[in-house]
């Protein structure tokens, strides 16, 4: 059932993807790591770090989630602790060793899998990454010192980036990278000496559609920006979340949250249509009233931090 996957599965997926990168430098595995790290893993922790839960539901419903048979494990809020708490220390282990998931070193050079701000020291070269990723797509790699010979700096180009849309500058000079991308990695090979590589990934809002074989998500749409998956919560969108329908050509805008618990996060504002039932009858031949409104979507990893309420990743489309 796709709506109640386990948190620890995301951690295992990252472990597996990283091992696969040791076998073959293929950007598909870096994509898997990135998506799991920014969504399926950090969503398990409350933003203040004091609470935790095991499942990554794509939908929660007060009165059902955590209560009804079959949904008791799908908690709508993170509990303080578990009788069997295997995953909290697993998260700590992963985060404290994050460097080896962000980078790889081979005989030919070094490879950046996820462009998070870091200082990385290798036998061949030292690299400092300056970025506000995943909110901002501008990433700068500073190479310190001089390499003894031609050395590869491989930079993962995420699969969510449209081909040809990445801007690359080396020491301020623009570079066409079309011929330099191999299996999802930009391969830059040269003798490095205090150089600077700047990339700009376009961080556009993207609609995501499920294969129609996924029955629960047929006719629905989800949203991503960069590697971040978004969700909708009742605290931001009054009424029943299932009453909202999003247009195929809906206007979508970004807004940086400037205060409160989500300060610094990029929120999405999406035009939608809201349906409201006329009367109290369970069934009626009177069509629902339709009104135009604007929905707010928040990063999925932040859900469940503002009280118990409805949450959905997949919204009805039109």
Question: Which residues does each PLM region occupy?
Answer:
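Short beta-strand segments within Ig-like beta-sandwich modules, predominantly Fibronectin type-III
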Residues: 175-181
């Amino acid at each position: 059932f796709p709506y109640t996957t386990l948190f620890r599965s995301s951690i295992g997926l990252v472990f597996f993807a990283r091992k696969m990168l040791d076998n073959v430098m293929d950007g598909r595995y870096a994509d898997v790591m990135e998506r799991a790290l920014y969504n399926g893993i950090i969503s398990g922790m409350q933003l203040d770090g004091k609470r935790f839960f095991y499942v990554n539901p794509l939908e929660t419903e007060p009165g059902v989630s955590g209560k009804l048979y079959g949904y008791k494990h799908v908690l709508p809020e993170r509990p303080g602790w578990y009788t069997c708490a295997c995953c909290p220390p697993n998260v700590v282990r992963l985060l404290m060793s994050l460097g080896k998931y962000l980078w790889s070193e081979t005989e030919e050079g070094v490879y950046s899998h996820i462009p998070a701000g870091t200082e990385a020291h290798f036998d061949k070269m030292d690299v400092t990454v300056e970025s506000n990723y995943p909110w901002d797509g501008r990433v700068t790699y500073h190479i310190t010192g001089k390499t003894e010979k031609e050395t590869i700096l491989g930079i993962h180009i995420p699969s969510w980036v449209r081909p040809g849309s990445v801007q690359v500058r080396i020491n301020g000079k623009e570079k066409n990278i079309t011929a330099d991308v191999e299996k999802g990695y930009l391969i830059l090979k040269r003798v490095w000496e205090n150089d600077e590589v700047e990339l700009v990934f376009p961080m556009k809002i993207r609609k995501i559609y499920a294969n129609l074989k996924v029955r629960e998500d047929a006719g629905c749409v989800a949203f991503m920006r960069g590697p971040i998956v978004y969700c909708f919560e009742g605290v931001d969108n009054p009424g029943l979340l299932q009453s909202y329908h999003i247009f195929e050509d809906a206007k979508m805008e970004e807004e940086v949250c400037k205060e409160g618990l989500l300060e610094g996060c990029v929120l999405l504002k999406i035009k939608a249509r809201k349906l409201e039932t006329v009367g109290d009858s369970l069934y009626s031949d009177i069509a629902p009233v339709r009104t135009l409104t604007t929905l707010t979507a928040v990063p999925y990893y932040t859900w469940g931090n503002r009280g118990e309420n409805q949450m959905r990743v997949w919204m009805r489309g039109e």
